[in-house]
Each structure stands twice: as C-alpha cells, then as structure tokens.
Amino acid sequence: MTIQNRIDPASSLPLEELLNTLPGGFNAIEDIKERRNVINSLIRMMTAELPPIDNIVIEDRNIAAPDALLELVVRIYKPTRISGSHPGILFIHGGGMIMGSIETENHKAAMLCETIQSIVVSVEYRLAPENPHPAQVQDCYEALVWMSKNAAELGFDTDRLAIVGGSAGGGLAIATALMARDQEFPKLSFQMANYPMIDDRNETPSSKEITDVGIWDRKANIEAWDWYLGGKNADEYAAPARAKDLSGLPPTFIDVGELDLFRDEDIEFAKRLLQAGVTTELHVYPGAYHASESFAPEAELSKQIWTKRIEALKRALNTNNNVL
C-alpha cells in the first residue's frame, strides 16, 4: 500500500488539491524566498476560512535580542476577560527553521489564548539560511526569559509557564526547555511538541519512508538541516535527539502522525524521556501526515488531534474552561 493510500480520507483531499495546484508540493520550489512567499500566501488563504478568534487583545512589542544590535519582535495575546491569574505559554511557530513567522501561525496562538484563557507570547525568531543555528534557539530562550521576568505586567502565573511549538517550533520548544534547564531559569511547568523536528541525522525508517508526500519529506528535511546548521556539527540545542541527558525536563506532550517523517525520531525521544523519569504523553495518529490538522482542519482526525492537545494543556496548566 502506498503512502497516499494510507492517508486519512478526510485529510487527503486538501493535500490532493495542493499537489494539483503545486505539482511536487512546496519542496518543488527551489528558491527559498519564493517558497516562503508561496507558503505565506497559502496560509493566509487557509486561515481566512477559519472562524475568527474573539475576546482577545493582541499587541506586538520589540524586546532586546541576544545580539545587542538587534531587537526581537514578540506578539502578545491576552484574554479580554482578565480575572485572577492566568497561565503563560511561549508559542514557537514552525517552518523547518527556514520559513514561517508569528503571522503564519497567528490563528493558532490566538486560539490557544482564547481556549486556554492563557497569556500567549509568540516569538519572531531569526530564520536560516540567513541566520544559522544557534540564532533560533537563542531568540526563543531570550523570549522565554523576557516573558518570565515580565510575568506580573503580562498577567500570568510563573508557576504555570508552558512552551508550545510544532515541527521546527516543536524542536525549538524542546531545545529551549533544555537551555532553560541548563541555565536554571526560567522554570517550565510543561512542554508541548507537536511532530517536533529534532534529529539532523535522517537515519530513522520513517525519515526514509516518507519521501513524496509534498508537505515535508526527506529531501526538504535534509535541505533544511543543511541550511540550519550552516556547515557546523549539531549540538543538543540544534538537534535535541542528540542530547545525552533528558532528566530535569518538564512534563512533556508529543504527538506525531503515522505518515510523518518525524514519526520514529519523536517516538524514540518520548521513550527516552520516560526512561529519564520525565512524565510524557505520546500520541501517534493513524492516517495523519505532517501538519495534516492544519491543512484539513475540518477532518474528524484533525479535531481529535486538537482536542487532545487542548485537554493536555488544560490539565497541565490547571484551567477549567470548556475544551473547544
């Protein structure tokens, strides 16, 4: 049975439409700037069809960056109904370390703010190849430190601080959590990594199996890692799968699709977290490809994926709002 035949039927149609419009998918676009433009346009069209997120306030702010010559842009999301203390979430967008922005995942961050009733900060980290590692994780860690130090002004409880990201954002969430552990600040109460990009070696069976889905596959992943590392060897902050010691990380939620090339590295990482004594919840979704819940939001599988995520965040952050 081919990979395409194993895709959840309701999640397959949007993928087929994408490949009809763009043969070969995103990976067929050689120029990185053109690829970014195409993906940004597609995401704008996709999010325009989603229901609006109400009852939140959004503010962009510049903060000091690790490089004193630069500033980081963070986008702050606050519920309009402020009552008591709220949890805090640092949200890290995906895009293979080479694409994406706070704008491309604005709807996700806003949805988390409204649904969890959380203060959410999304960080506009620098992208490769223009800025190779460690720029990305440095920016994310700087945003996490800033967020924690400004908790009172932002309006969240530092004892309920989580980090959330998907794909490259999931890898950066884990890397940032590793850095926070090593620097002993700030203390994270939870990390959620959705199909995280964490292993530069591309040696797992799934990394060799998923080669032509069109969303994110082996060729795209190898190319992105090459750009991200910029010719240097990967350390644990670049590729968390290389970390030898996973103890001391916060309770963790990982999910990944059966047909995602990150499947095996994510399953192995979850196993190692458990062996290191880290409370870990793992979900592997049959029929799901990389980011399928974003491309097919109306599919029942996508709704199931989001329900599990929201439930986990509410449990971890001790909130009592309705799931969706």
Q: Where would I find each of the regions flagged by the language model?
A:
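A glycine/proline-hinged amphipathic helix-loop "lid/cap" segment
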Residues: 1-76, 318-324
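Hydrolase active-site cap/lid region
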Residues: 178-233
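Gly/Ser-rich "nucleophile elbow"/oxyanion-hole loop immediately N-terminal to the catalytic nucleophile
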Residues: 148-163, 183
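Short beta-strand/loop motif that positions the catalytic acidic residue
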Residues: 254-256
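Proline/glycine-enriched tight loop/beta-turn segments at coil->beta junctions
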Residues: 69-72, 79-88, 247-249
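Short amphipathic alpha-helix adjacent to the substrate-entry channel of hydrolases
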Residues: 103-122
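Alpha/beta-hydrolase active-site loop
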Residues: 131-153, 309
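Catalytic active-site module of serine/aspartate enzymes centered on a nucleophile-bearing elbow/loop
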Residues: 299-324
